[in-house]
Each structure stands twice: as structure tokens, then as C-alpha cells.
Amino acid sequence: MNDKLKIAIGTDAFPPTTDGISNVAQSYAEKINQGLGEAVIVTPKNPNQQDYKYPYEIFRYKSWWIPTKEGYSVGWPFKPELHQAIIDRHFDLLHSHCPLATSYYFKRVAQLHPIPTVLTYHTKYEYDFDRCIPGKPAKDFAYNFMLKNISAADEVWVTSAGTVESLRRFGYQGDYVVMPNGCDMPKVDVPQSQVDIIRRKHNIPDGVPVFIYVGRMIWYKNIRLILDACKILKDRGEDFRLLMVGFGANENAIQKYFRKLGLADKIIYTGKVLDRAEIQGYYGISDLLLFPSVFDTNGLVVREAASCATPSLLVAGSCAAEGITDDRNGFLCLESAHSIAVRLQQIMHHKDYPHRVGKAAQEEIYISWDDAVRRAYDRYHIVIDNFKSRQ
């Protein structure tokens, strides 16, 4: 068996479009090319692409550009010559990280040429489908398109066991493998000098509890619950600061809402931050990550926070809370603003409490991308062997 594999890493989002899946694809490509084998990114064209920055091949295919803040391109992989372009690269396996355009692309290639395919299902797409697609006929078409792409994969991976519920909603009844994501941030004790820089930059008083939210600014991540909980705390006379790091479709509405609640003096809105070391600094100054999302299937930010020994407050039973034991390596709450506020009051006045739990999170739930991709790469060999045995 040839241990060195050539893998196509398919993703519908890649820089300059940035989201969780984009980060995952970059990590897979980087780690595979650092000695395991060869990885090529397969992704739609983007008018702002700067692929020369990356030390591995990036194959771009035709797309339609959507001029939004997120900057997504819609892949258009329907030209026959595009299928041949993948075949001619002699990949050992095609691994898609999105069950939309790129998965359709890989499905068509596999129909023309025998090659094993893997799909990692990262996101609860029904949220976006139900929110954005008007009318039942169009929605039914989208669900069916997605199901066909998922079912075409030789092996389906999920990043958490709870993600399977979303797969079943699309009608997928097949088997799956749980393959957790890693974290691209190393374990660190953020230097006090870096913490002081952030404290001065945002005028954060010493001794005031600092919470943080990192991620897309979109309502269905339960950001309203965070803001309502902060309102409860302020009404109870509590002092604190909430750092909001990220951007997204609802960012203007979110800023308008927290100002309406009278929280402008408590919330620090940083906007888009791409520098990973800077983001670690924000985690380092924070006592607690607030992440009550029930939308996310894995919650990369929970592991990012853990890399800095910052614990997370999560909704009990959510995918993001898998592996979390309350008061040991994280904190759990109900999916309500009141429950979040109660937990914050229990935590915020005991500095050593979140520090101890954060250290446990750093040791128990942190997974490096080296370990995560090594595990995935070993699984590639099994997928290939199973595929060959069926031919």
C-alpha cells in the first residue's frame, strides 16, 4: 500500500471567504502537505482570491459571485471539462467539506471515474435552507439536492455525534463516522503583556469580569440570548465587559439591539479579526467564552478558547457541549437568557473558579489539528481499501 496519498480537499468557501469550514479546509491541506502526503484545495473561483499566498495547489472552478459581507461564491461545476481536470490529477480520494456545489462536483467525477469520496458534514444546513429559501417547491428541491450529494459519498463523517440529527432531517439514513475537528491555535498561557495591550486598547478596567463571543454575527447562533442575559446582569448592578469578535449578516442589527438595551458601555464590538495571534489575545483576557449556539455541530471556538485555558458556557445537550462536564472542563446552562445570567453570576465573582475549569478544558478537550488530521488521514486508507474491495 502506498502510504503517501494525494487528496482533493473540496470546500465551497476558501479565503478570502472566511468561515469555520474554510478554516478546516486550510488545516487539512496544511497538515497533509507537511509530510503525510499531498493535498490540493478544490474550491470555486473568487474575484478577490490571492492563492499565491498558500504553499499548496489551489484548483479553482467556475462560480457566480455574491456581493455580500461574507463574500461567498456559488460554485458552478457543470462543465464536462471540469470533471476531466479532476480526473487528470490522479487523486487517491476526494474529500468534500460541504454537501453543496463541490460535493456535486465530486459526485459527477466519481460517476465518470472510479475514485472514493468522503463527505464531512459540518453545518446544520436546515437552518439556512428554512430561513433563506422561499416556498415549499424550492425548499424540497434543495433538500433533495443535498440528500443526493450526501448519499453519493462512500463514507460520511460528522464532527460530533449530535450532528447526525441534522443528517436525518435531510433523509440520510446511512452510516457515519465521528471525526472531530482540531484547533489551529497552540496551547498557550497568553502573556500578561498581550493582555495589557488589549486592556488598554479597549479601556477595560482591571478586575472587571470579561466575557467573549467569537464567531459569525448571525441571530441563529443565539446571540440574542447573550445580549438579553447581559441586560439582566446590568439591571442587577453587575459590572462586566463583553467582547464580540467577528462579523456577519446580522451585525448591524445586533449592534442596534444591544444599544437599544442600554449595553453600549458594556459591550466592545471589535468586528472582523483575522490575525490568529490577536484572537488568542482576546481569549487570553477573557474569563469565559459565551457560546449558547445550538446551531453549530462542533464549535471550533470552544477548542480555541481551551487552547488559552479559557472555559466556555454552553447549552446542555448541544453539539458544542459534547465532551463537556459541567464545572469540570466547562459550564452548562439552559437555552434561555435567564439561565445564562444565573450561571454568569455564579461564575464571575470567583476568578479562580473559571481559571481552574479553563485549565481542565485545556488538558481535556483541546485537540490539535496535527492529531485530528493524522486520524483522518489514517481513515482515508480504510476508505480506499473498502472502496477497492467493492470494485
Give each language-model segment a name:
Residues 128, 316-327, 331-332:
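Short acidic/histidine- and often glycine-rich active-site loop of Leloir-type glycosyltransferases
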Residues 150, 272, 280-286:
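Short alpha-helical donor nucleotide-sugar binding micro-motif in glycosyltransferases
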Residues 294:
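Aromatic "clamp/platform" in nucleotide-sugar-dependent glycosyltransferases that forms part
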Residues 311-315:
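Short hydrophobic beta-strand element within catalytic cores of glycosyltransferases
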Residues 326-327, 331-337, 346-351:
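Conserved acidic donor-binding segment of nucleotide-sugar-dependent glycosyltransferases
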Residues 353-367:
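A short, well-ordered alpha-helix in the C-terminal region of glycosyltransferases
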